[in-house]
Amino acid sequence: MSDKRRYFGTDGVRGKVGQYPITPDFVLKLGWAAGRVLAKQGTKKVIIGKDTRISGYMLESALEAGLAAAGLKATFTGPMPTPAVAYLTQTFRAEAGIVISASHNPYYDNGIKFFSSEGTKLPDDIELAIEAELDKDIECVESAELGKATRLNDAAGRYIEFCKSTFPSDLSLANVKIVVDCAHGATYHIAPNVFKELGADVVAMGVEPNGTNINAEVGATDVRALQKRVVEEQAHLGLAFDGDGDRIIMVDHLGNKIDGDQIAYIIARDALRRGELKGGVVGTLMTNLGMENGLKQLGIPFVRAAVGDRYVMEQLLAKGWKIGAENSGHVILLDKVTTGDAIVAALQVLASVVGSEMTLHDLSQGMTLYPQVLENVRFVGNSNPLEAQAVLDSVAAVEAELGDKGRVLLRKSGTEPLIRVMVEGEDAELVQSSALKIAEAVKASC
């Protein structure tokens, strides 16, 4: 079997709705192919959640039809954060969990991603087996063996209680005012309740999904509205989740953005303070040098993985460590969850705020972020701009100018047709001009 994936990217199957492969007929067949493979594994039970995109209804029906044709039973949770589906898959002893979401992407995109029975991303061999089944014609099981669909009405309540259980029982969020931005996404009916039930004064925004407003000028990918609201409300801090609840970006009381690197640093330092840190921290190639240096000053080991929470997880498991993060807001805490969980990560930072009696702003000052600029260049076709001589020359020139006081990273996005150009260094103006220079070279080579 070839290890070359045709459909599965770094985070499942994703694309624009109505365009292959995110079409009703393909998703039906994907459900059947997954069902064929999963039926050989055990219970024939699958948990299905989704975010708030209007296309979720269509894709949910197609997916369930395919699973039923393969003889699997589907349990629907309705709109539910990705990490909640991972949790429910474990607690219900299901063979797999499936999430219909395109995470932080616009509403017109959608995707399908799978979790194993342990609540982790599917192993490579299972994904490849599913792709192999997609080459076959659909064969329906006998009528008596067809799968049924049921709905889990208390899914939200179960997950809310789990999230609360990860917050120290001797602490409370009483007298803490929090602005919670749910991006009109899957956390809209969950996150505000978690923090309210722990005692916080919650101001909720991004909690009116209409099918087309997910991630639209709100949430973890655009915190400007949250920054303004935190200052207006004189809140202690703000929390921004992405559309499917696996990314968290925070805002301090002054309106400053606190990214995934800073969040992981705060959590690791607090674990060290309490004598509970197990190993070090895993970041990615995009992790800010400031985080690496900040951890080094504390004597906390740090390694970089490839970009993508899948690769952060691989490094965590290989090293036996518990804390991993991407600066985009994926934070994985393996002593509490099996995948990136934005609500749980936020609760650990809040525990540090309350337990240390320090502000989020003060906690974030332990590390100094280097100026970092990210330029995204859209490309089409099968060409590889990263191999163009003009791009290579541009990168070499910038690296020579930065010397040992900065770095350059170019990579293809695993979820979108983008080339990501990242430049980081001590000199903000040089970093900005260098990123634009390389981005122009990439555009000219596309």
Curated annotation (Swiss-Prot):
The active site is at S103 (phosphoserine intermediate). GO terms for cellular component: cytosol. InterPro entries: A-D-PHexomutase_a/b/a-I, A-D-PHexomutase_a/b/a-I/II/III, A-D-PHexomutase_a/b/a-II, A-D-PHexomutase_a/b/a-III, A-D-PHexomutase_C, A-D-PHexomutase_C_sf, A-D-PHexomutase_CS, Alpha-D-phosphohexomutase_SF. Its EC number is 5.4.2.10. The keyword Isomerase applies. One of its GO terms (biological process) is UDP-N-acetylglucosamine biosynthetic process. Catalyzes the conversion of glucosamine-6-phosphate to glucosamine-1-phosphate. This is Phosphoglucosamine mutase. It comes from Vibrio campbellii (strain ATCC BAA-1116). The lineage of its organism: Bacteria, Pseudomonadati, Pseudomonadota, Gammaproteobacteria, Vibrionales.
